[in-house]
Amino acid sequence: MKHFNGKVLFLDRSNINTDEIIPAKYLTEISKEALKPCLLEDLQLEGFDPIRDIDGKSVIISRSNFGCGSSREHAPWALEVNGINLVIGESFARIFRQNMFNCGMMAVELSPETIENLFVSFAEKDTLIETDLEKQRFIFKAGREKKQVPFEISEFDRQLVKAGGWVEFADSKY
């Protein structure tokens, strides 16, 4: 099972599409490692610098419709090779969300109010997250501030995550 704890990267924008996650010019790459330096290089977000801001982060928190656009598995791969196995947002493009779980990663939806509260409380701080998959809760920490946030994923998605992805899950069952 992959790791879902660590430092949080807040991306305060909706509709971050797969071309911004990993530009189309890199889709001929067959090595995940080759995608590593290209993650979010085309993201248009004031003050964001992928070279400075991605390193050491394990989780992204964004707004709505994350992963919209082309249905490419390269987007989760580029996140994964950079150590980002969890994206939290108000909503996700359906295929992107499923690709995340198929890769043993998580795309977790929280209410717009909860996302807004996380941005207000934690976006300007060095925030850490702990994920309890069994109890389905996140624990956010920044300095002395701490907040627990429940989440829900289906039992099937939880099994995909625990197995490491769709291929590993299928291998264990068939």
Model features per residue range: what roles?
Residues 1-4, 32, 124, 144:
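A generic structural signal for short, non-catalytic loop/turn and secondary-structure boundary residues
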Residues 1-26, 168-173:
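N-terminal, positively charged, Ser/Thr/Ala/Gly-biased leader segments
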Residues 12, 17-18, 22-23, 31, ...:
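Glycine-rich, flexible loop/turn motifs
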Residues 16, 67-73, 161-170:
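Conserved phosphate/anionic-ligand binding catalytic regions in large, soluble enzymes, centered on
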Residues 28-135:
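Feature captures the catalytic cores and cofactor-binding loops of soluble hydro-lyases/lyases
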Residues 104-174:
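Acidic, glycine-rich flexible loop/linker segments
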